[in-house]
Design a protein with these regions (language model features):
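Conserved alpha/beta-domain cores
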Residues: 1-216, 224, 236
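Gly/Pro- and small hydrophobic-enriched strand-loop and loop-to-helix capping segments
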Residues: 226-240
Length: 240
């Protein structure tokens, strides 16, 4: 039984439709085909009821930052018969891999070889293959998470060789959240890095995904080739 009011449900549904429309407009303006860009609804600040309302509004790709939050929501969704694709976009500690793996469809935040090795081992034991993105620290800021650009090629080769990980692309956060030319330059650099990796790894590895863009800079991300937008606050405007 959902505790969210009918008014809240209507507001979330309206927010979802507005974001869909805005993203479609940005995709068209960028000269890209409809359907090239997926919206991952980031529900890290809301409870299971509001997350469920978002799913029921049509957002079936859901993102969480914390593994513990994902576990609880995934269990609740499963009990209700709802089947979203869960995207873990925050840091995953190695001691939380086993509990997380059955739920995760995508991991956006693969940021070390140690984590990749542990993930591959656990995925092998569970007889599954996990879709992963390498998180790159495009800002070169030591306080930020993600792989340094200088290590990206070497680690990508090692991850691509792991049989239970399916390397599909890169994830990055812009150093500024307000969008504009600064964001476009950084997103363009991420796209260029992905293109270089694709050449390096060859046709056996399909790097077709770029997880770039959030509520404040998704237009710039779309213009520079993003395929996954991590949208949170815009979907819950008027509620949070």
């Amino acid at each position: 039984m959902l505790n969210a009011s009918p008014e809240t449900a209507q507001l979330i549904a309206a927010n979802w439709q507005r974001v869909l429309s805005e993203v479609a407009e940005a995709v068209s303006q960028a000269g890209r085909a409809a359907g090239e860009v997926q919206i991952v609804g980031v529900a890290k600040y809301v409870d299971v009821d509001l997350t469920t309302q978002l799913f029921d509004s049509g957002c079936h790709a859901l993102g969480e930052n914390r593994p513990q939050n994902l576990w609880g929501k995934a269990d609740a969704f499963s009990a209700s018969g709802r089947k979203p694709v869960w995207h873990l976009i925050g840091h995953l500690q190695r001691n939380k891999i086993r509990r997380s793996l059955p739920h995760i469809g995508w991991l956006h935040s693969l940021d070390s070889l140690r984590l990749a090795t542990a993930l591959n081992d656990e995925a092998a034991a569970a007889n599954l293959r996990l879709k992963v993105l390498l998180e790159v620290n495009i800002t070169q800021d030591a306080t930020k998470t993600g792989l340094p650009v200088s290590e990206l090629g070497k680690i990508a080769e090692q991850v691509a060789a792991m049989p239970h990980l399916e390397l599909r692309g890169l994830m990055a956060m812009c150093s500024r959240e307000s969008g504009g030319d600064w964001a476009r330059r950084e997103f363009a650099e991420v796209r260029s890095l992905r293109d270089q990796l694709q050449i390096q790894l060859g046709s056996h590895c399909q790097l077709d995904q770029l997880s770039m863009g959030m509520s404040g800079d998704y237009r710039e991300a779309i213009a520079e080739g993003s395929t996954m937008l991590r949208i949170g606050s815009r979907l819950f405007e008027g509620i949070l």
